[in-house]
């Protein structure tokens, strides 16, 4: 029972609560992952087969977010509130640092993996806002990352299967021979950078709004964090659209002129993911209302 585990400072000394909180925190941020515990994720994604890529992006990372909410926030509400400004700055550092690493990658899988890690930084920022807007945005962001980056890895697997490479410099102009793949990839890329009416727009907006509305004592730090987060979205648009341009829209290389477009099965899978991305982008409340009542209870405890 989570309620019976709630750490009470009258029973447990503060130093003990902080020690246990930090141990849980490190365990879960390795799973998410956050900088500086993130190196395992891009390395595994760059070497793993397509099913493993999709499983990691779609499920494993979210178990870490669940742990942060279920244990660090609910079992240690007072300590989480104490650490909130630090966690918000940590989330911003994660967004910037992972985004910078994504820019310099030559392989598509590593680039997308670092972009995924960068996007998960918005989850930490949202949780640290200590208000319903930020929290709801963080949970929505976690779900959106699972869908969007799973779709990314499906696209990559389709390209890799045909070209036997994932190096950006070795690819080019595939949109001319794989038009279905290009259009579906465009929807996924637009969602990843936060284009309105696609799945990742609403959670990013909610997280940044939650940061601006936050009542944390370090108001200046919070406002700066929100502005940096907004700038990071612009930067992410640059490297994600560079990937799209280089792989699908540049000059078609001679060796790729005979490759085939997506099969009906591949088209069906990617179309289903894109429909989910569009639907929850247009109707975000259809997913937020599922957990909104629970989020209000969690935030009420933190604001006591």
Task: Give residue spans per PLM region.
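Hydrophobic transmembrane alpha-helices and their helix-loop junctions in integral membrane proteins
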Residues: 1-205, 209-241
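Cytoplasmic/organellar membrane-interface segments at the starts of transmembrane helices
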Residues: 176-180, 240-304
